[in-house]
UniProtKB/Swiss-Prot annotation:
Keywords: DNA damage, DNA repair, DNA replication, DNA synthesis, DNA-binding, DNA-directed DNA polymerase, Lyase, Nucleotidyltransferase, Transferase, Virion. This is Probable DNA polymerase family X. GO terms for biological process: DNA replication; double-strand break repair via nonhomologous end joining. It is found in: Virion. Repair polymerase. It comes from the Viruses. It comes from Acanthamoeba polyphaga mimivirus (APMV).
Length: 354
């Protein structure tokens, strides 16, 4: 459905992404900022177009949908009338295009974000993954452990994880948690919880009803409790499920790589959450980002603060008073919003619900 429109917008996204990367190479901050916003807008419009449940026969069919602006409507009109976008053209020389593709490589390395890629380019003249490996070998540049692991698994880690595989991993993770303590529970959040068919990584929350606050969680021995999180990470490592650590913050957070049976290596994050923060943490880590942003804005308008730890009311002295939020629905209602199920939140990201 709408395949021609989606095809042209996919090509436009690639072109603007190339322009964005080129502005980084040229160290043109003004162009970089402009292209970053252009890219974000096109990505949003493309996501909405891919999730429409009707055929567009007139550009005005999508008028009024959040995320679809006048520029998008104009482009759709052009595609419907001519079959293509005239914005699309070869903007760079073969040499420049090769350089841009090298930077795209860098940003595909786990641990390298936009700012790090820009630093590698501007300060060290690194233009590709091969350049980076050589620079590390010769001692020209030093990088973090997470980037070293990203290079180790570059081309090996696959990010499109089928839902069926995550469901099997969820059963394994839950089973291993219950072996440590029957009340130790896990929830896989992110796009998986929103019902998507594939996910980029595995985002796990863990909780125990007796560990209500960070005090019990970080210092379990003081409350006659077991160090559940550390025991859990050790157990998954011994079983060969966790194969490499990016970071391990005892009693709190693990980031690393996992492998389930004969499936490819995957990225996984496991966070231990205080039980009193379970609802806001589930809300935050389920996403999508657009909804989180809207809800934080709604909280701010009500002189509240919303984050993954809770919903707080600020008193006249500036102190943050936590509100009673036993469920995600409590948070929606406290902000004057209708409750959205995790599946509805995925529709929110595509513009079908707002």
């Amino acid at each position: 459905m709408n395949s021609k429109i989606i095809e042209q917008f996919n090509l436009l996204e690639k072109q603007v992404d190339a322009e964005y990367l080129n502005s980084k190479v040229e160290n043109d901050l003004k162009e970089e900022t402009m292209n970053r916003f252009r890219l974000k807008s096109i990505k949003k419009a493309l996501s909405i177009l891919k999730n429409l449940d009707f055929e567009i026969t007139d550009a005005n069919d999508v008028k009024g949908i959040p995320g679809i602006g006048a520029g998008t409507i104009k482009r759709i009109k052009e595609i419907l009338e001519t079959g293509k976008l005239h914005d699309l053209k070869d903007k760079f020389s073969p040499e420049k295009q090769k350089q841009i593709e090298g930077i795209q490589e860098l940003e595909n390395v786990i641990g390298i974000g936009s700012s790090t890629a820009k630093k590698l380019i501007s300060q060290y003249g690194i233009r590709s993954v091969d350049d980076l490996k050589k620079a590390i070998e010769t001692g020209k540049v030093k990088v973090s452990t997470s980037i070293m692991l990203g290079l180790k698994y570059y081309g090996i880690v696959q990010r499109d994880i089928p839902r069926k595989e995550i469901t099997a991993i969820e059963k394994l993770l839950s089973k291993e948690a219950h072996k440590i303590d029957p009340d130790l529970e896990i929830i896989i959040c992110g796009s998986y919880r929103r019902g998507k068919k594939t996910s980029g990584d595995i985002d796990v929350l863990m909780y125990h009803p007796k560990m209500k606050t960070s005090k019990e969680m970080l210092h379990p021995e003081k409350f006659d409790l077991e160090p559940y999180f550390n025991l859990y990470i050790d157990r998954l490592t011994e079983k060969g499920f966790l194969i490499d650590d990016i970071t391990f913050n005892p009693n709190k957070k693990y980031m690393g790589f996992c492998k389930y049976k004969l499936n490819p290596v995957r990225r996984i994050d496991i966070r231990f959450i205080p039980y009193n923060s379970l609802a806001p943490a589930m809300l935050y880590f389920t996403g999508p980002m657009e909804l989180n942003t809207k809800m934080r804005s709604a909280a701010k308008k009500r002189k509240m603060i919303l984050n993954e730890y809770g919903l707080f009311k600020t008193d006249k002295n500036g102190a943050q008073i936590p509100l009673d939020t036993k469920s995600e629905a409590d948070i929606f209602h406290a902000l004057g919003m209708d409750y959205l199920t995790p599946q509805q939140r995925e529709l929110y990201s595509s513009g079908k619900i707002h």
